[in-house]
């Protein structure tokens, strides 16, 4: 599925408030328009898994972490989960809601989503090779937050030979999808 990343995350010269509003519109579009159609066409009793690589991992993580009741799991590959990397420290309410590292850090320990997260299968994966530094750094931060909040998320750091590339994302998906589908019926 396409995104509006060129109008939000990657639009470096855009007005920050417009960019963050565009991202929030995209999130709402996924939840309010795409998800109902997906579920209407879903002939199984399983909730969907949300997944994506690179900026798609960021979008997948935002979607899952903000609405865990709608999905059975998450596979996020090589994402950057802190809005500072794209907005250079600027933040408003819309951007806050779309920056997993920010909103999870401030989530109360008794928030009902934590129980929901722990009923799901959550996988974050990043390589440690070319173009993976920022993703690895933000995943280390997320792992710390998950550990502090007692959220059972699998944060997997692959080797220094694993680069930010489709070749590796296909390998990772072939590895993780069967794990997420276990016990799905």
What residue ranges belong to the model's regions?
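Non-catalytic cap/lid and distal C-terminal segments of serine-dependent acyl enzymes
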Residues: 1-185
